[in-house]
Swiss-Prot record:
It comes from the Eukaryota. It holds the Pfam family Oxidored_q3. It is a multi-pass membrane protein. Keywords: Electron transport, Membrane, Mitochondrion, NAD, Respiratory chain, Translocase, Transmembrane, Transmembrane helix, Transport, Ubiquinone. The gene is ND6. Core subunit of the mitochondrial membrane respiratory chain NADH dehydrogenase (Complex I) that is believed to belong to the minimal assembly required for catalysis. Complex I functions in the transfer of electrons from NADH to the respiratory chain. The immediate electron acceptor for the enzyme is believed to be ubiquinone. This is NADH-ubiquinone oxidoreductase chain 6. GO terms for cellular component: mitochondrial membrane.
């Protein structure tokens, strides 16, 4: 996971188009969420996927695909750069120890039930307000492009 995270973060910077950069950023967020999930931070891993990949990255991809941006090719990533990157990040991936994805399934369901109860009872109005803000931002992006 560390190698994938490192490669996707550097390719997000080096890509030529914004859509390709956002795709690499989504890969970075998913690999970070998987790393958090495997370390025992189940809730944080799921929130990473929900918040970053599910909402923000899709909104940016939608806006960038509608804006018809012009770009000029600046160059490519050389094979020497990829080799050096792999050599620097490989020791991190070799020393990474996995302890299993899910150790106790009861803890996972208890966390999810607790978060679901909190979101849909106590924070229901804030959740609806956030959904309205997301809908307004999508409508704003659509109106800008017309």
């Amino acid at each position: 996971m560390n190698t994938i995270s490192g490669m996707s973060s550097l390719t997000a910077i080096g890509m030529l188009t914004p859509v390709q950069s956002m795709t690499c950023l989504m890969i970075l967020f998913v690999s970070t969420a998987m790393c958090l999930y495997s370390q025992g931070f189940v809730l944080m891993g799921m929130l990473y996927v929900t918040m970053y990949v599910g909402a923000m990255a899709m909104l940016f991809l939608f806006m960038l695909s509608l804006l018809k941006m012009e770009y000029t090719p600046q160059g490519t990533i050389t094979p020497l750069m990829v080799t050096l990157l792999a050599m620097c990040l490989m020791p991190l991936d070799i020393t990474y120890e996995t302890y299993g994805m899910v150790t106790q399934m009861e803890n996972v369901t208890d966390e999810l039930v607790m978060v679901g109860n909190q979101l849909y009872t106590e924070y229901a109005m804030l959740l609806m307000l956030t959904g309205m803000m997301l809908m307004l931002s999508v409508m704003g992006a659509m109106s800008i492009t017309k």
